[in-house]
């Protein structure tokens, strides 16, 4: 268990270390800015993979282990990472070409795409509330709803 946690922490550190030079924080601290759309694609792909890993770990924490306290740091991290403020700046118009799974439809339907992130933030907040209440049945349902929210956006906007 400890070895798995250490390997996961090292992998996350390596991912963040590699992604760090690709982007800079916006002057107003609203999120990252990118000099090159390819950097944005690489960064957002790694961030989304990280979110997926967090959700899998939270499912293990909350459903299998029923450990809300152990899940707290991951819930906090998920709240920060799975937000429009964090991810939307990486969806630079036209960054749907080579190396990206994004469809051009994202920029044609930008408001709907943004609304998907609001729905995601709401699902994460609901999951946190369930975990804080140590309501594991509700947390299980919220994890499923969170996954459905991700999936609905992926079906519409990802190849």
Feature names for model-found ranges:
Residues 25-34, 38-70, 76-159:
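Sequence context surrounding c-type heme c attachment/ligation sites in exported
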Residues 20-24:
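Sec/Tat signal peptide C-region and signal peptidase I cleavage site
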């Amino acid at each position: 268990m400890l070895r798995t946690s250490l390997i996961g922490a090292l992998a996350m550190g390596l991912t963040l270390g590699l992604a760090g030079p690709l982007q800079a924080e916006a002057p107003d601290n609203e999120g990252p800015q990118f000099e090159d759309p390819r950097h944005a694609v690489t960064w957002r792909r790694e961030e989304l993979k990280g979110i997926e890993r967090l959700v899998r770990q939270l499912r293990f924490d909350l459903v299998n282990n029923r450990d809300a306290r152990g899940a707290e740091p991951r819930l906090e991290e998920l709240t920060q990472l799975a937000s429009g403020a964090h991810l939307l700046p990486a969806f630079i118009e036209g960054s749907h070409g080579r190396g990206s799974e994004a469809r051009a439809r994202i920029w044609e339907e930008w408001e709907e795409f943004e609304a998907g992130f609001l729905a995601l933030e709401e699902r994460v907040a609901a999951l946190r509330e369930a975990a804080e209440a140590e309501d594991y049945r509700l947390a299980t349902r919220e994890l499923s709803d969170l996954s459905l929210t991700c999936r609905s956006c992926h079906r519409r906007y990802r190849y």
